[in-house]
Amino acid sequence: MFGFVINKLKNRKWLNLCLLMGVALFIALFVCHPMFEKGAGNQILDRLFTDHATQQNEYPAQMSREGTYAVADYPDSQSVLDKLSGYEKKWTEYVDINKVSSQQLITLSGGRADTEFGGLNHYFTIGYLPGLSEYADVVKSQTDTATFECSISEKTMDHYGLVAGEKIYLHVPDGSGKKEISFVISQICREKDINDPYWAKTLSDMGDVIFVSQDVFDEMMQYYSEDNISYSDFLMLDYRQINTENASLYDGYMEQFKDADKLYND
């Protein structure tokens, strides 16, 4: 009789232990379920970003603005670049994600041009791209000091049959007719890595731009005092920092940017 009671107590102890373990596992399942759900959501977000990059051939997390400023209001290139950087700063005050890269391009309308080796009546835009030397490979040529140096893309070179060292004679308005300015092609350039996030807009996308230094660009602005400066600004963000906890918040901020600024895009 005594042994029977002892066995019942032992069995009850193991039964209680099993029940306790079951309850603990049950509680753990409910506690961990949101974690599993969150992890799955983050994986889905990451896959969506990756698929977008592959299918659309563009960096998946970017904020951008394109438009024009009057030369009369912005007398030099740095004032325009500072304005664009101000937009980037404002965006990231709300969308608190690390910057991966930023591409800023400013251009003047340029004009018709002839080229040294027989090209007639081509149209070129004058541009300044601050990141060109860092993100593009170049083929250099010898130049003289009597002309302004410029760089062109391989696409522009092929399109017009230009070569390094060739001169471009650009006709620009000076208020009393036409004035000719000579540029010499000092560099042919192409993207070092076209898949780098910096190349939100590739050299081919930029059209027939003759790229000049910042100093030369500022000098050209004197001939376009009644014109506008066109600009594009692309800010690339680290999409890996976007997750299920902040995606809705950041999306809301971006929608507010669109409502407040018709030139903004993402």
Model-derived segments and their meaning:
Residues 2-266:
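Membrane transport/envelope proteins' first extracytoplasmic loop
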